[in-house]
Amino acid sequence: MIISMDQFGAKPEQGFDNTLAVMSALEYCREIEGAELVFPQGRYHFWPDKAAEKQLFISNHDQEGLRRIAFQLTDHNGITIDGQGSEFIFHGPMIPFVIDHCRNATIRNIVIDWENPMFAQGTVIRADDDSFDLQLPEGTNYKIENDGVWFNFGGKTEKVWGLNEFDPRTKAPAYQSGDRISWGNYRKVRIEESRPGVITYRGKNIQLPQIGNVIVMRFSRRENPAFFVNGGENVILDSINIHHAPGMGLLAQWCRNIRLHKFNVMRRPGSDRMVTATADATHFVFCRGQITIDQCLLENQLDDPCNVHGIYARITEKLGEDQLMVELAHGMSKGIKIAEPGDLIEFVRRDSLLPYANLRAKNVKVLNKDYIIVTFDQPLPDDVHIHDVIGNRSSNPDLTVTHSTVRANRARGFLITTAGSVLLEHNKISTPGAGIKISGDANYWFESGDVKQVMIRNNEFMDCNYCCPDWGRAVIDIDPEIENPEAYEQCYHRNISIENNRFVTFDVGIVSGHSVDGIRFVNNVIETSDSYPPHHVMKYPIELKACKNVTISDNQWPNDSKAIGLVNDSEIKIT
């Protein structure tokens, strides 16, 4: 059944708030299985003032309580929303789409943007000694107070906490810029207004940006994704352009089967904005079934284009022979469901990341956003330790990424930590950090877990890792956070195949890794470029340690006579 938004009073007019019209339309559609809600093509505006409000715990985002929502889809079955190419323009802090426990939902043919983004930018007009000047665009509303620069976003005044340098020629992070004027380094600088619209930054030993480069000024962090998919199954996001989001482009958690087709997080053509989303383009937590990413462009976001993982929960107390208290340790994982009754739960050592037992969850009792009591179907292992972690083996989706492009973002490319079957094929990857990162940790982000079957095939890697070592040591970086991987007989990751890819690189490092049982690097072509000066972080093109069953063969190196790798502390001739 096709339903037009005209029926509910939607208007593609500047200054008209369409939030209530959408709310009424979605309530109507909830009672109609298979409803198709259609927007006549236009430019529709949304404000948070009269939007629905809900407590949401969104993984890897700021956990700040109530959020305002424009499109709140809850328990819809078979709904389709077709924008027919319409632009949805948002104002201030709100989530455009929440898809909560819906089945067979499709969103297609829309453009998402914010009238005013959650960042500011300026141009470097002077840089010498221990200071530089930043020229803000004419008319920028800001203030300098308490040795800080402040901007307004959605009625709140936010303090800048970091700077990222972009090259206006490539529209990408500048060579070797990294996060070197952010976080702790930013707190060391002194700030003053040299004249209206020009800010001077001073500090000993700060990394000076290049004159003419663009500085992105970051305030707040990860307020709201453009799409939040929570639970449900069979969700399709098709032909969607996200030009800005004050958080991630998409955060999906506990969803079974999600498909992204022509889902683009991309700069608006003709815009001078350097940034799209202020965090990852796409992010999947505790998902199940199949994740498919096809023909997508993910660019210029302030974190990775794609991250797939679970969450390790830290053991804090043994309550009985079959019962544990666990904690969600990272601030951006608070309140996230970790398991359901019947799920297979893995017990993992914090220091080695190696599993030592598997039990089924019998009951999962959430005390609050921090602590959870898990009761198991059998007695706990005798050697369970406080500060070990548990992971959910039942939430390990398969991932397929094809015919997609990732580029010009801050940080890395694909972050993969799922034990499901993974295929990356026919993609173009150009990132300032590692193009692919396969990790796992139980110390900071607590992002689980090990991979079991990864195929990286027929991709092009173009000048990756030009901000090194900030976001990786090599084009492909396999670095589970194990302090001394050589101390353990067992490996954390398994079966990683890198085949028939083309690597164009200005530097040496192609693959760096440890704790992998079964790694293949076969039939790849490596070419040199002069895009950037080499940084020489790695001595050898392939450096592996604490690895087993390594195959390196039939590759084309720029200079075969010098193709030497380092495997388990031994130099070997690689072909």
Q: Where do the model's predicted regions map?
A:
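N-terminal extracellular ligand-recognition/capping segment immediately after the signal peptide
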Residues: 7-9, 19-26, 32-79, 84-98, ...
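Low-complexity, polar/charged sequence tracts that form flexible coils or short amphipathic helices
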Residues: 89-91, 98-100, 219-220, 228-233, ...
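Solenoid scaffold repeats with emphasis on beta-solenoid/beta-helix
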Residues: 3, 35-37, 71, 79, ...
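Conserved GTPase G-domain signal focused on the G5
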Residues: 6-22, 28, 294, 439, ...
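Small/polar beta-strand repeat architecture
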Residues: 173-222, 357-358, 365-399, 407-408
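Short glycine/acidic-rich loop motifs that flank beta-strands on beta-rich extracellular proteins
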Residues: 34, 90-96, 116-120, 223-226, ...
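Ser/Thr/Gly-rich low-complexity blocks that favor extended beta-strand/coil architectures
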Residues: 90, 114-116, 137-191, 334-369
